[in-house]
Amino acid sequence: SGSCAVRTCWKQLSSFHETGKLLKLKYETAVRVHSITNDATGETELISPKKHSYTLKNHIPRTTDLVYIEDSPNFCRPSKYSPGTAGRVCSKETNCESMCCGQGYNTQSLLVHRPCHCQV
């Protein structure tokens, strides 16, 4: 008499929440690199900052690190990239503090009259 075993394997994505947490962690620990172009080949290479300026943010990146070449603009202030947060509409209960970059916000109450098109 023999026994049989069936084993089924599959890959499954992490939950959206877990993926978001990991991506945020990678963003917060991203490593700045510089790009140079090899004149002989025309190829661009990414190089880490020099070892003598070593800090937590300036270490040699691993293949799993998120890297960046230049700082992101401050989207809270008006610039060529963004109109800033002035005049932005937000939901007071959920996201005004983050969407207005902690600069405060004004509330406004509106009374709107609309015909109801009721049938009698």
Curated annotation (Swiss-Prot):
Q: Entry's InterPro entries?
A: Wnt
Write one Pfam family the protein is assigned to.
wnt
Instruction: Supply one GO molecular-function term.
Output: cytokine activity
| Cellular component GO terms, alphabetical | extracellular space
Query: Predominant location of this chain?
Result: secreted
Q: Using the chain's own numbering, where are the disulfide bonds?
A: C90-C101
The record, for PANTHER family, names:
PROTEIN WNT-9B, WNT RELATED
Q: What is this protein called?
A: Protein Wnt-9
Species, as recorded: Alopias vulpinus (Common thresher shark)
The major lineage groups are: Eukaryota, Metazoa, Chordata, Craniata, Vertebrata
